[in-house]
């Protein structure tokens, strides 16, 4: 799984966990090997026919609901070739890397314990626990707030201690837009930058004349 010498260095994609209020970086999780493919699905947020107004047919309620799916591979083979330089890999295999990804879907144990303590003293309303805001980073033009909606882990090989040493991780993420994050938040500012970059990139696309479609006019 080592890179061939002489090849240009490829940027790593990954997930950045930040404080949702200030944007301060709490943790960066880079993919060991970038996925070969990534599937993005956009579901339009239109007004819909239920409004009864035909003029609403071309109106949008907001940005589409964008879902990103990818599979990432983890492999400890290279590190295990140099055990003295990678003692944690020898002892735990891929457990630390997998745990970092899994913790995106967990609240902190401290928050859980605080709610348990509040429930024990009869607190009626317990506030849902706030997690760090996850950002999906895939190059300079795609840094976007997301919610990890599904995480699947397939452990494919193990060492003698049954630590996983090769695994495949399936990630499904929903892009969080203005409707999800609210007006005036740090995450909304980041999404708007993502939205505006899309507009800029769309403006760089080639202008195609009607003749290319075999027509001279629409009506």
Where are these regions (language model features)?
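Acidic, Ser/Thr- and Gly-enriched intrinsically disordered low-complexity segments
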Residues: 1-219
């Amino acid at each position: 799984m080592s890179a061939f010498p002489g090849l240009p260095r490829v940027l790593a994609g990954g997930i950045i966990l930040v404080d949702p209020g200030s944007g301060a970086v709490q943790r960066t999780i880079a993919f060991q090997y970038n996925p070969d493919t990534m599937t993005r699905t956009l579901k339009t947020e239109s007004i819909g026919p239920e409004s009864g107004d035909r003029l609403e047919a071309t109106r949008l309620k907001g940005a589409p609901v964008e879902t990103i799916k990818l599979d990432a591979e983890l492999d400890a083979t290279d590190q295990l070739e140099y055990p003295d330089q990678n003692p944690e890999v020898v002892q735990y295999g891929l457990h630390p890397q997998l745990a970092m990804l899994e913790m995106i879907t967990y609240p902190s144990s401290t928050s859980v314990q605080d709610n348990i303590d509040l429930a024990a003293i009869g607190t009626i309303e317990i506030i849902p626990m706030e997690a760090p805001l996850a950002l999906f980073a895939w190059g300079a033009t795609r840094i976007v707030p997301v919610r990890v909606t599904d995480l699947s882990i397939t452990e494919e090989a193990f060492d003698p201690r049954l630590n996983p040493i090769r695994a495949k991780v399936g990630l499904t993420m929903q892009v969080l837009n203005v409707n999800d994050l609210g007006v005036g938040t740090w995450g909304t500012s980041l999404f708007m930058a993502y939205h505006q970059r899309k507009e800029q990139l769309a403006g760089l696309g080639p202008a195609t004349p009607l003749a290319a479609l075999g027509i001279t006019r629409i009506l």
